[in-house]
């Protein structure tokens, strides 16, 4: 119909499918290359056809350009959250424990097993620590493996809560953790930041940028990042936050200021409106 196409990628779709196909045991090895090539063909077609292509962070835009998208089509529009809903959550009252939260689905891509092993190592050095894993089950078999691992390691201080009201539950937490193998721009980190909770993450997607800030950012570090599947690094990073309440408070303030400036829902909506107005203007202000 010769209509303009607007493409939004929260992750790099083709790269994510490539990772899944490479890992998939049920795909015949000789067919994997063909299937991956098919997704790259689709990616090239939509990049060529699109009027605008948006993504969540700068490195994702660089990848889109490397994959053949014209730089002039690309825009970065960050995720936005309801800042006011979370910013008033009080810091946890001192009770002799350090409580770590993980707002995460029980799925292999979230690498809950590495989180559990890292907490096991942390528990050898910090005794008064608890881990709250908050989220539903995406993969029942994987979830059962995680439950069994906790039993095998005799980790009584890991709590699987299921889905919770994150606004209410955040009051119980000192900081949060995310151990994903792949991410875009995780909302769970932004929500933690809005509530003045620093975060430990893996160095995937936009996590490093969220923790350290963009070039123009003046707020300072909001937590620590380590390589994916690096349990020792995760344990060390968690320990740094466990042993220093002033460090948690300072990084939490940095985190909240960063979200307030760059990642509010209102900012995101206005940036998308600008893209729609560009298309309207191109088409003589006719309907898209």
Question: What is each PLM-predicted segment?
Answer:
Residues 81, 103, 130-144, 160:
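Glycosyltransferase donor-sugar binding loop
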Residues 92-110, 116-119, 132:
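Conserved donor-binding/catalytic core segment of Leloir-type glycosyltransferases
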Residues 213-231, 240-245:
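Conserved acidic donor-binding segment of nucleotide-sugar-dependent glycosyltransferases
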Residues 198-201, 205-212:
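Short hydrophobic beta-strand element within catalytic cores of glycosyltransferases
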Residues 181:
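Aromatic "clamp/platform" in nucleotide-sugar-dependent glycosyltransferases that forms part
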Residues 12-13, 32-53, 67:
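Membrane-proximal helix-turn-helix segments that form the acceptor-binding/catalytic region
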Residues 143-163:
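Nucleotide-activated donor-binding/catalytic signature segment of Leloir-type glycosyltransferases, i.e.
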Residues 59, 80:
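Carbohydrate-associated surface elements
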């Amino acid at each position: 119909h010769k209509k303009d196409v607007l493409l939004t990628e929260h992750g790099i779709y083709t790269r994510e499918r490539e990772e899944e196909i490479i890992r998939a045991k049920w795909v015949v090895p000789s067919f994997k290359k063909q299937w991956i090539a098919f997704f790259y063909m689709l990616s090239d077609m939509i990049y060529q056809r699109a009027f605008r292509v948006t993504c969540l962070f700068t490195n994702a835009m660089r990848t889109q350009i490397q994959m053949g998208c014209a730089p002039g089509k690309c825009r970065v529009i960050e995720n936005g959250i309801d800042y006011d809903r979370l910013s008033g959550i009080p810091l946890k009252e001192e009770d002799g424990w350090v409580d770590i939260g993980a707002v995460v689905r029980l799925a292999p891509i979230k690498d809950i097993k590495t989180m559990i092993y890292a907490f096991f190592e942390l528990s050898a050095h910090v005794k008064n620590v608890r881990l709250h894993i908050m989220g539903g089950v995406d993969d029942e078999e994987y979830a059962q493996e995680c439950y069994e691992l906790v039993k095998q390691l005799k980790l009584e201080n890991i709590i699987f809560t299921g889905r919770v009201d994150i606004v209410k539950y955040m009051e119980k937490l000192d900081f949060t953790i995310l151990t994903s193998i792949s991410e875009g721009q995780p909302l769970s980190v932004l929500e933690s930041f809005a509530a003045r909770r620093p975060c430990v993450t893996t160095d995937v997607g936009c996590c490093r940028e969220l923790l350290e800030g963009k070039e123009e950012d003046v707020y300072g570090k909001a937590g620590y990042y380590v390589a994916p599947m690096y349990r020792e690094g995760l344990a060390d990073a968690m320990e740094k936050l466990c042993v220093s309440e002033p460090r948690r408070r300072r990084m939490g303030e940095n985190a909240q200021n960063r979200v307030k400036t760059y990642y509010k829902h209102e900012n995101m909506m206005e940036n998308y409106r600008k893209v729609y107005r560009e298309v309207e203007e191109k088409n003589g202000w006719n309907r898209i």
